[in-house]
């Protein structure tokens, strides 16, 4: 046990140092490279502080949020294939953001910054609830049934987004397209502050529920006998995962597979104890998305690739390998 804790702590420290290095490196890269010495120049310092740093920190937040949501969903459904993108949760959030973009809604000035986030969280909460009800109704349902439900939800949300694209104007269509591919180019300090006000408390709340997630892996009856209010804790976890996915999608669009890939990789190194799995997954998700976004900004300069394309290129093959691996096991 002590050896396992030491190993997990080493992984946590290593990921923390890697994230710090990636933040410093990512903030210096782009069409205009900014060295440490250049920060003494006012023009370069303004670019670094108001353009580069908010984007880098937003990538950290979104990556951590998606990875943490993946840990919650895999623990909540006790299914290694559970992921915000595959189950349609991200699509539900994106659909509601599309509704906020295309259809006219009037919000008080104080709530304008929160408009898309409120819609995105509502969309993710609805989809999470539907998936949860499906799993509760068919407790003996297979992994394939869960994936088929996700495919159906993704298809419905995709069709609805297509309708919104059809009735929207040219500017709204462009905004929706960027949203569907995943993009962090709109990062600003106000956006970062709004996102962090949802994501950071949700990650901390998830960490506090790590013991509950460990007990839920034993099954609902066993967890109940050990003193867990299963229904209430599942509702809390469902709400937290909806907050994480909704807040992430509202500022970045759909970025897939981080919630699938990262928990699996971290579980291989730290084991299934959620007390280490949650914080290490959050750090690893932040590292992965930050690396992907840095590549997206530098591969085709001066243009930028949508970061969602890069994460899909990574996650797609991993997902196929995971399906083949589980088929061989069964």
List PLM regions with ranges.
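Alpha-helical transmembrane segments in inner-membrane proteins
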Residues: 1-330
